[in-house]
From Swiss-Prot:
Expression restricted to testis in normal tissue. Expressed in a wide spectrum of cancers, including bladder, breast, liver, lung and colon cancers. Its main location: secreted. GO terms for biological process: acrosome assembly; fertilization; spermatid development. This is Acrosin-binding protein. Keywords: Cytoplasmic vesicle, Phosphoprotein, Secreted, Signal. One of its GO terms (cellular component) is acrosomal vesicle. Residues 26-273 form a propeptide. It is found in: Secreted; Cytoplasmic vesicle, Secretory vesicle, Acrosome. Phosphorylated on Tyr residues in capacitated sperm. It comes from the Eukaryota. The lineage of its organism: Eukaryota, Metazoa, Chordata, Craniata, Vertebrata. Residues 185-272 are annotated as: Disordered.
Length: 543
């Protein structure tokens, strides 16, 4: 068996991303300063190459697996910063995630919160003020006076990586489309010889040694060693990467390396040969792949480029069943199963096409509990992917009496510590859990510590980004048709109404609706009102 996606994606994405020599096409009115953010026009061009979202998700998988020190991602990050990856705090255009301690943290935040097209912007205050050491000193003080926002200043950066820009290739879009097409292939035919020769020339400068990538990840906090490693890596060829791809395409010996599927080797050890004995799954795995390709907005790109299905003999549809199943297991194990498009497609296929229905039961007499939209299905699939014996899904009947939730699902939930409440159409009440703590705790902390508290701001940021819907996804409207200038004021109002046994939810902002816009001054009054009411409540209880 060929190596799974974990080993394939890095090699493939090196081919995918290297042609992106961005160049950062300079606006006629503004020169590109090394280390500065891209202009709106440059970002538009940059993000066009990562649209639709499944393209951005492909790069995020590589970042999650190999970290920011991966040479391919270093190059991509250089492009986004006019050649220099800043060493220190950076700012973004996200309303409640306005700055990050590093550009790497910013990119991880975009991926983990699915805001793939958030932009880096110039900071409105000096970078030194936003540095981690300064923040620790501020937090240690008894009281913090608000910082006056100043006009944007010229960026100050220290260099971790540098690159000389090349013009945007004329064939850039075509190359990216072609290579992204290949990203859906796991072990397909080799590319045309002349194309591989071209890659060999263009990619001669790319470092690909995996042990250096891992070494860079383990020593991210040691900047000097990182820079030294980066220099040592420069000038390396892509011979190893090409050999890895070739091995994936030609190796017919069934092999499985669990360590390539998970950072914890013992956490994922499926026996694919055992799963082969599950005929309902194996015989319909190709139908699942088709379904997965058509949901979550991926149908648009496939409708426009339907020739991919017919002309790409290395696509998932042509994979042997065991390998396709391995890819699916990898997707739900390495990510949070209940929020993955893979799980949604898989669930749809088994419910609608295979006829299992909504309830989820297995051959051990267990009935998997539906504590959230995909919890029962993910509970079963995580068990199947990890199982050393044959575990089959069955249609539920009276013989399935044991309620069950996989501990593997619980461990995934604990790793993020957040739980989204039951969704309503166009509405969002908030996270049931954040950091393992309920909303009442966070409302209380908001009232006592304020919006600027580090933990409170993290809660607000996560909630804000958990719901982006409507004509204006980044604006904040509620079910009383009030529009708020910031998320803290909305959450204060929601906590206030919750304390009065009245439910107010965030609602998508629509173009054809009229809202009462809250001024910044009024929004501060809302925050203060909740703080005062909470203080009165606690004084009444304890005094």
């Amino acid at each position: 068996m060929r190596k799974p996606a974990a080993g394939f994606l890095p090699s493939l994405l090196k081919v995918l991303l290297l042609p992106l020599a961005p160049a950062a096409a300079q606006d006629s009115t503004q020169a590109s300063t090394p280390g500065s953010p891209l202009s709106p026009t440059e970002y538009e061009r940059f993000f066009a190459l990562l649209t639709p979202t499944w393209k951005a998700e492909t790069t995020c998988r590589l970042r999650a697996t190999h970290g920011c020190r991966n040479p391919t991602l270093v190059q991509l990050d250089q492009y986004e910063n006019h050649g220099l990856v800043p060493d220190g705090a950076v700012c973004s255009n996200l309303p409640y995630a306005s700055w990050f301690e590093s550009f790497c943290q910013f990119t991880h935040y975009r991926c983990s919160n699915h805001v793939y097209y958030a932009k880096r912007v110039l900071c409105s205050q000096p970078v030194s003020i936003l540095s981690p050491n300064t923040l620790k000193e501020i937090e240690a003080s008894a009281e913090v006076s608000p910082t006056t926002m100043t006009s944007p200043i010229s960026p100050h950066f220290t260099v971790t990586e540098r690159q000389t820009f090349q013009p945007w290739p004329e064939r850039l879009s075509n190359n990216v489309e072609e290579l992204l097409q290949s990203s859906l292939s796991l072990g397909g035919q080799e590319q045309a010889p002349e194309h591989k020769q071209e890659q060999g020339v263009e990619h001669r400068q790319e470092p690909t040694q995996e042990h250096k990538q891992e070494e860079g990840q383990k020593q991210e906090e040691q900047e000097e060693e990182q820079e030294e490693e980066g220099k040592q890596e420069e000038g390396q060829g892509t011979k190893e990467g090409r050999e890895a791809v070739s091995q994936l395409q030609t190796d017919s010996e069934p092999k499985f390396h669990s360590e390539s599927l998970s950072s914890n080797p013992s956490s994922f050890a499926p026996r694919v040969r055992e799963v082969e004995s599950t005929p309902m799954i194996m015989e319909n795995i190709q139908e699942l792949i088709r379904s997965a390709q058509e949901i979550d907005e991926m149908n648009e790109i496939y409708d426009e480029n339907s020739y991919w299905r017919n002309q790409n003999p290395g696509s998932l549809l042509q994979l042997p069943h065991t390998e396709a199943l391995l890819v699916l297991c990898y997707s739900i194990v390495e990510n949070t199963c209940i929020i993955t498009p893979t799980a949604k497609a898989w669930k749809y296929m088994e419910e609608e096409i295979l006829g299992f229905g909504k309830s989820v039961c297995d051959s051990l007499g267990r009935r998997h509990m539906s504590t959230c939209a995909l919890c029962d299905f993910c509970s079963l699939k995580l068990e199947q992917c990890h199982s050393e014996a044959s575990l089959q899904r069955q249609q539920c009947d009276t013989s399935h009496k044991t309620p069950f939730v996989s501990p593997l699902l619980a461990s995934q939930s604990l790793s993020i510590g957040n739980q989204v409440g039951s969704p309503e159409s166009g509405r969002f009440y908030g996270l049931d859990l954040y950091g393992g703590l309920h909303m009442d705790f966070w409302c209380a902390r908001l009232a006592t510590k304020g919006c600027e508290d580090v933990r409170v701001s993290g809660w607000l940021q996560t909630e804000f980004l958990s719901f982006q819907d409507g004509d204006f996804p980044t604006k904040i409207c509620d079910t009383d048709y009030i529009q708020y200038p910031n998320y803290c004021s909305f959450k204060s109002q929601q906590c206030l109404m919750r304390n009065r046994n009245r439910k107010v939810s965030r609602m998508r902002c629509l173009q054809n609706e009229t809202y009462s816009a809250l001024s910044p001054g009024k929004s501060e009054d809302v925050v203060l009102r909740w703080s005062q009411e909470f203080s009165t409540l606690t004084l009444g209880q304890f005094g």
